[in-house]
Amino acid sequence: MQFDLSSHKGKSNRLYFTNDKDKQFETSIREMYKLAKEKPLGADYRFYLRRYLINHLKKPTLFDNYINKVVIITDGYLESEGKPADTKIYGFESQLHQAVSIGNILDVITSKGLNIPKVDIDLSNSEILICEVNERKTGKGFDFEILKTYWEDWFKRMNAKKIVFIQREQANDLTAKRVTEFVTK
């Protein structure tokens, strides 16, 4: 789902996010959850960034400065259908869980060469919100911090201006509120 705010030049972006847009967002989220339950395939975010997002990012000009806001709704695990996982946890649980306890997750990921491969895209004018991250039962207490490290490292290497990473909320209206806050700031 995409919201193009370029027509709101000089206006508060808050004017764009009306009750109708909130309802559209909530309806779209419900539909995505329904589709995910019916056929739980992982999204290929690397492909999306490389192929599609790059064409939708606004670049600053001499006259206008743009900040792109990208909202990613995911469980946090980068596991697209038919491809090896980009967020490699399984097989490395003992080292990664220990790294969570010690606080050196990125060091372990990097030393083992597990970093998510960088996409050739400049996100220096982009703020990223990754939301609805949900640990699996086997990773409770550890996977959130590991996934957060994977995603933050990945987006930092693509020069993202700001990265916000939030866990799954128990109510859709809380997620909608967090998204609205992110987009309007």
Task: List where the protein language model places each region.
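Solvent-exposed loop/turn segments at secondary-structure junctions
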Residues: G76-E79, E135-K137
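Extracytoplasmic/secreted proteins, especially bacterial periplasmic and envelope-associated proteins
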Residues: D44-N55, I72, N104, I146, ...
